[in-house]
Structures are given as C-alpha cells and as structure tokens.
Amino acid sequence: MTVFSNTSTQDTKGTVYVVDDDDAIRDSLRWLLEANDYKVELYDSGESFIAKYDPNAIAVLVLDVRMPGMSGLEVQEHLLARKADLPIIFITGHGDVPMAVRALKKGAVDFIEKPFQQAALKAQVEHMLNEARERRMKNERQSLNEALLAKLTPREQQVLERIVAGRLNKQIADRKSVV
C-alpha cells in the first residue's frame, strides 16, 4: 500500500482521493492537483483506499477502473453499499461503452479515458468539490434545524404548526389563550 498526502490549508478546499495502480498516473495527478491547492491522497489499490477512506471528508474520488485485486467498479459497489456520499470520477486506459454506462448508472459523475485533458479533469474535480461542500452545508443546516425543532415544547410545536398553516398571530392567540 502506498499512501501520500499533503496537508495544509488545503483541507478547506477539499480532498481528492486518487486510486490507480499506475505510479506515473498517481504522480501526475498529485502534481496537477496539488499545484491547484488541493489536498491529495494517493492509493495504489482499491483495498488500500477502502481501509483509509474517511466518510466525513469533503472529497471527490478519481478512480481507475481496471486494477489488480479490487477493480474500480468493485470499489464503487463497496461505497454504494456503505451509502457513501462521494462523487466518483472514473479514469481508464481501456474502457468500453458498457463499462462506462454501468459506472454512470451507479452514480459516477464522469468517465474519462487516459490520456485525459488536465483542464477538464481539474474543472470536474472543482465542480464536484463545490457540490460536496454545498451538500455538507445543507445537511448541517438541516441537522441544526431538526435539533432546534426537537427542543420545542409541545405547546411551541402546536403554535409553529399553526404558523406554518398560515394562521394569523391573532387566530393562534385566540385558540391557545395566548396573550
């Protein structure tokens, strides 16, 4: 297992997991992504990635389809079984249409053939990390709202229900004997 990471203020931008059995591809992607201030974690196999994957990270996965051991499609299946919220960009030197269709139907966001256009990959990574950050903020707001609602007394919940139903303050006060 080979794991490299570059930690700094890049954590706020998000993490790019790169899983590929080809050293040259991993190094090339690390160079490209770190030059654009991303935190990059490199893995040489699906198994090593699965062992270290942090489901709480704001991240995107750049994943080779064909690797010895666990294939990229098997990694995707494993992540789906864990209900991981992780955008996957597949890269491959030997892809075919049925393979791409299968990956995309299972939720992959892109399927790119090697050699790939660096600008296109970088743009897709940026787009997916932005979406991941937005989803995280939305989920955090929803959790906060649910926690606040759970703290309401039964009477406060009834008042809130009437407000949501469009009742006027005066109508709510009359019904609840609220002054």
Residue ranges and their predicted role:
Residues D96-P98, I112, F116-V125:
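C-terminal output helix
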Residues S143-V179:
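Helix-turn-helix DNA-binding segment
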Residues D44-S45, S71-V75:
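Acidic catalytic/metal-coordinating carboxylates
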Residues N56-V62:
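Active-site beta3 strand of CheY-like receiver
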Residues M1-Y17, D23, R30, L144:
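Non-catalytic signal-transmission and effector/linker regions of two-component phosphorelay proteins
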Residues V65-M67:
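Receiver (REC) domain active-site loop signature in two-component systems and cognate sites
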